[in-house]
């Protein structure tokens, strides 16, 4: 009988024991994933590790006062959640725009947007959780000459006009 009343799913031979929920311990993340100079990525969820079909998830660490090279992630959408530290994001064809995010903040990066992550702290590692809209990591490193002074951009919530900025 269908679990949700609408779709029937074949019960796997193990009754979901090993093919259902997966818990990936933080000390078993895979650093053998696409990298960008200036940061360390580690995969938790992808096709090879858990059979994910539509997402990739992992962690990103950027050392104090360090920055990544400019890059984009092809057709993928990315969500970055700041666990600790302060992120300064630059984006655009010449990295001409800038915004900052801190613990508890989310960052959305649309497909093909050239961007750069910067640890805005000189003494704290920037630690983030990263989720992408495909099961494999796609990173296209770019050779961009950034503008000297990027333009600050504040986000305006299109739904809750008096809410977040």
Question: Where are the regions that the model predicts?
Answer:
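Short, charged/polar surface micro-motifs in flexible loops or helix N-caps
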Residues: 49-53, 63-67, 84-88, 137
